């Protein structure tokens, strides 16, 4: 204690100096990185910071290339009537016959398109209709004629009017049968059948 009460020498002052630790430059860099919010470690003298920057720039360049590719696809499809508001459409699967190299479908030639002829169908339907009309039994006409004559004698106006219209239509159909036969001939299998001839019916009084 006596030594402490004496005069203070410079060596004693050096002993009482607070110990200040010199900071390493690498620790300073780590501290600055932590303050800036960087999550990757950086050591002085390493190339991690440069590699990170290089990788980030490559990712940005890759994104730019993808954006340019999408824009080129949109510009390519703009003149073909395709909706370009959304992401570019994928080229549909198609054969080389009706699809060009740029994915645009073309209409097939008219010669290659299948053609279906309706002529045989019309001939068969009309021939069967004519055959059916010609093969109506004579008994049906006789019964209808008798019913019509009775109604005319009774004098019902509504019944006479309806029967008169029916008879006129039937006579018109009988007159049109020869024209239908010339326009649409009956099939050979139908012609071999024995068709009962239609007898001439006396004109009924329409009054």
Curated annotation (Swiss-Prot):
Top-level taxon of origin: Viruses
InterPro entries recorded: Corona_nucI (IPR004876), N2-like_embe-CoV (IPR044311)
Presence of keyword Aminoacyl-tRNA synthetase: no
Keyword terms of this UniProt record: Virion
Any one GO CC term of the record: virion component
Major localization listed first in the record, in broad terms: virion
Chaperone keyword on record: no
Cell compartment(s), UniProt: Virion
Function as written in the Swiss-Prot or TrEMBL entry: Structural protein that is not essential for the viral replication either in tissue culture or in its natural host.
Family from the record: Belongs to the coronavirus I protein family.
Note: The gene encoding this protein is included within the N gene (alternative ORF).
Name the record gives this protein: Protein I
Classification of source organism: Viruses, Riboviria, Orthornavirae, Pisuviricota, Pisoniviricetes
């Amino acid at each position: 204690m006596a030594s402490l009460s004496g005069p203070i020498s410079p060596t004693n002052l050096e002993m009482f100096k607070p110990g200040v630790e010199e900071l390493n430059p690498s620790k300073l860099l780590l501290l600055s990185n932590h303050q800036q919010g960087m999550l990757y470690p950086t050591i002085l003298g390493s190339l991690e910071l440069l590699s990170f920057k290089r990788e980030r720039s490559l990712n940005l360049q890759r994104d730019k290339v993808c954006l340019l590719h999408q824009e080129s696809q949109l510009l390519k499809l703009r003149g073909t009537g395709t909706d370009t508001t959304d992401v570019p459409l994928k080229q549909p699967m198609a054969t080389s016959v009706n699809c060009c190299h740029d994915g645009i479908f073309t209409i097939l030639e008219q010669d290659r398109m299948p053609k279906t002829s309706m002529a045989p169908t019309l001939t068969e339907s009309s021939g069967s209709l004519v055959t059916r009309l010609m093969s109506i039994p004579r008994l049906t006409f006789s019964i209808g004629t008798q019913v019509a004559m009775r109604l005319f004698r009774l004098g019902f106006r509504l019944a006479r009017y309806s029967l008169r219209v029916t008879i006129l239509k039937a006579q018109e159909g009988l007159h049109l049968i020869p024209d239908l036969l010339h326009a649409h001939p009956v099939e050979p299998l139908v012609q071999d059948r024995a068709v009962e001839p239609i007898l001439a019916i006396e004109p009924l009084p329409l009054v």
